[in-house]
């Protein structure tokens, strides 16, 4: 998508009520303001404890501050039909939305869908 709508989650529960010394006020809100000056269509900080109830449907991308903040609810909603990517690196890093699934080795039960989603994302990047 040309101009995706991006949700940026806060770090603390309830965005630490946006108190003066919270990471949301010191770091996240200024970063969002900077992104907006670059015409990046982003919103936040959004509390991570409520976005996955329904609000996630209004966004193309959800940026979390750490792995389980996003992936735990994301997997509950989408199972393994999704990918995740890591931002802030010098290279593109995408990953299927599941772990190594060592218990499935040599059992012919693993799904290849998430891997194909990664490949298709990279091809269209």
Model region roles, listed by residue range:
Residues 31-125:
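Glycine-rich phosphate/nucleotide-binding loop
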Residues 1-45:
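Glycine-rich phosphate/diphosphate-binding loop of Rossmann-like nucleotide-binding domains
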């Amino acid at each position: 998508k040309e101009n995706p709508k991006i949700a940026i989650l806060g770090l603390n529960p309830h965005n630490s009520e946006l108190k003066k010394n919270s990471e949301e006020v010191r770091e996240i809100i200024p970063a969002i303001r900077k992104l907006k000056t670059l015409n990046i269509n982003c919103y936040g900080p959004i509390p991570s404890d409520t976005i996955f109830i329904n609000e996630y449907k209004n966004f193309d991308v959800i940026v979390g501050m750490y792995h389980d903040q996003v992936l735990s609810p994301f997997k509950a909603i989408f199972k393994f039909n999704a990918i995740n990517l890591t931002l802030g690196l010098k290279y593109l890093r995408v990953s299927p939305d599941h772990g190594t699934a060592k218990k499935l080795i040599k059992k012919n039960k693993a799904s290849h869908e998430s891997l194909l989603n990664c490949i298709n994302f990279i091809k269209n990047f």
